[in-house]
Each structure stands twice: as structure tokens, then as C-alpha cells.
From Swiss-Prot:
Species annotation: Mycobacterium tuberculosis (strain CDC 1551 / Oshkosh)
Protein name, UniProt field: 3-alpha-(or 20-beta)-hydroxysteroid dehydrogenase
Similarity section: Belongs to the short-chain dehydrogenases/reductases (SDR) family.
Protein role: Probably involved in steroid metabolism.
NAD keyword on record: yes
């Protein structure tokens, strides 16, 4: 690796497995020091042991303000500051609008939206003190377009997209950038029950976690120094349009004339 993040300290939520663990490893590989949190303590401790002195694991329930404060304090105490936040933690639940329980709705808002808000709020002070910062909010393509039966997930991911923009405007004068990443289907433990071909993507496959992590590294680095309030899509072409794969088998001469 080329040391693109040397001198930076990052905090990652939901970092014990899946995309979060991939983000942690990718940033450490580029020279960052990383504090990462999760509620999956055994898995988190295993990742921390693998990365040795470059990383610290903390228990972090993103719905709890005090645990965010403790995570930030760990970063500042252990590594001398904080420059990057990756709001990665999230959950998915599904159900028809008629049957979707209020408790499920409230739970997903607490984790996917309030958790992001609390994370942003917790890192502003140390980032202002550093005179710079990069906040990376992991949204989803469901933050760009709706999906049937994913009502809470879609609502929270749209909201994260909006929160990204309002905080980018507020924090920009302090040198703090805020951007959102919108992955499509990614191969993680959270999505291992989802058929890989559920979306017709231009590339014809789901993403590997590292393909999202590569973008996280870019946004954490100074290479993205003029990017803020923006949406970065990593979806294999899912939201580019409908992939009518059967059209390729139709002879051009046999296509009817369509009138709109």
C-alpha cells in the first residue's frame, strides 16, 4: 500500500465484521490508526488482535451517546486526535407497510439514523481542534430509490443522505468534509440471505466489501479534499437504469417501432 492515510486517526462504527471490518483493514493498510466499535465484542476483539497496535476495539452501541463519547476519547487518548469518522453501523428489517411493527420502525430509525447523528455530533469537537476532518456516512442505493418492503431501511438511508448535506454545509468552514456512500448489494453477513441476482446490475454481480472500502479510503484521504456534501455510488450500475438483459437476444430488424 502507498500510505495514503499516514498521520490520520479514524473511528468506525459497526467494524467487527462485514463491510465495517473491511473498512478498518483497508484504512490500517494505508497507514491510519483506527478505533472501531460494535456490539459484537468477540468478533471485534479478534479483528483488533489481527491488526495489533494499529487498531483499538471498543464496545459501541450507536444509539447510546455516552458510548460515542467513550469511543472518541479512546481515539484521542490512544492516538492523539481524530480525523475520520465512518458511520457504518446499520441494520435491515423488512415487512409490508400494513404489517410493519412500530417497534421495528423505531428500532431501525434509532440505529440507522439517530446512530449517524450521534456519531457526527461526537466527532465535531476533535475535528475542529484538528482543523480538518472527513465524515463518511454509509447510506445505500435505498437512499436514492425505494425498495418494496424495505420501508424503514429506505426512510433511514434517504435521511442519512439529507443529514450528510446539511452537516456538510455547516461544518465546511471548519475544514470538515461530509459525504455519503451508496452501496448496492454487498456480500456481507447482513445480506447473505439475499439472492445475488435480486438486482439486475450492469456488472452482473454483487460487490465485495473491499470495493466499498476502496472508496472509504479515498474519502478519508486528502485526495478527496474538495469533495463534500456529495453522494458516491458503488452499485455495479443498479441505479443507472433498468437492465433489460433479454433485449440482447432480439434481432435489430425484428424490433417493433415504439411510439411514446
Amino acid at each position: 500500500m502507498s500510505g495514503r492515510l499516514i498521520g490520520k486517526v479514524a473511528l468506525v462504527s459497526g467494524g467487527a465484521r462485514g463491510m465495517g471490518a473491511s473498512h478498518v483493514r483497508a484504512m490500517v493498510a494505508e497507514g491510519a490508526k483506527v478505533v472501531f466499535g460494535d456490539i459484537l465484542d468477540e468478533e471485534g476483539k479478534a479483528v483488533a488482535a489481527e491488526l495489533a497496535d494499529a487498531a483499538r476495539y471498543v464496545h459501541l452501541d450507536v444509539t447510546q451517546p455516552a458510548q460515542w463519547t467513550a469511543a472518541v476519547d479512546t481515539a484521542v487518548t490512544a492516538f492523539g486526535g481524530l480525523h475520520v469518522l465512518v458511520n457504518n453501523a446499520g441494520i435491515l428489517n423488512i415487512g409490508t407497510i400494513e404489517d410493519y411493527a412500530l417497534t421495528e420502525w423505531q428500532r431501525i430509525l434509532d440505529v440507522n439514523l439517530t446512530g449517524v447523528f450521534l456519531g457526527i455530533r461526537a466527532v465535531v469537537k476533535p475535528m475542529k481542534e484538528a482543523g480538518r476532518g472527513s465524515i463518511i456516512n454509509i447510506s445505500s442505493i435505498e437512499g436514492l430509490a425505494g425498495t418494496v418492503a424495505c420501508h424503514g431501511y429506505t426512510a433511514t438511508k434517504f435521511a442519512v443522505r439529507g443529514l450528510t448535506k446539511s452537516t456538510a454545509l455547516e461544518l465546511g468552514p471548519g475544514g470538515i468534509r461530509v459525504n455519503s456512500i451508496h452501496p448496492g448489494l454487498v456480500k456481507t453477513p447482513m445480506t447473505d440471505w439475499v439472492p445475488e441476482d435480486i438486482f439486475q446490475t450492469a456488472l452482473g454481480r454483487a460487490a465485495e466489501p473491499v470495493e466499498v472500502s476502496n472508496l472509504v479510503v479515498y474519502l478519508a484521504s486528502d485526495e478527496s479534499s474538495y469533495s463534500t456534501g456529495a453522494e458516491f455510488v458503488v452499485d455495479g450500475g443498479t441505479v443507472a437504469g433498468l437492465a433489460h438483459n433479454d433485449f440482447g437476444a432480439v434481432e435489430v430488424s425484428s424490433q417493433p417501432e415504439w411510439v411514446t
